[in-house]
């Protein structure tokens, strides 16, 4: 897969940002990656997340909608989520106290999953992370060995799926009018 990595780092304020844009083509099918996190080592799995990919943590009833693509880790996604949620909390505390409390509780639950800095093999509170990418361009690191018989990665799974017409429209593979009429060209039909 081809990606363009854009990275920014400000030497004055310390702000850093990395963003990924897919340079290659949209894949023939969408994909869903599922990772069962049980150790700190699982939190360090590399992730290439396209701008079409949403992330779900079912145990928290948390769904992170698709936004800018990035190269990160599971831990990085959770840390970014806490940072983004906390951004408006001081104002929200006075303007919408009930919403403030709910967001604060969610941030605490995410921090609980992040745990303390410990050894990579140290167990953490188990949870599942699901990446759903209709473009098929995201990737989650596979830590097993494909060649060896006993080296499978039992915590990692990938499932490809055919896209819906709505997903094809969102990806620019089909126009709105073609989707309404049930026609149009999708990548699956052309191959």
What are the roles of these predicted feature ranges?
Residues 18:
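Short functional micro-motifs and their immediate structural scaffolds
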Residues 1-4:
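Short, flexible, mixed-charge glycine/proline-rich loop motifs
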Residues 6-15, 23-191:
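Long C-terminal interaction/binding lobes of large macromolecular proteins
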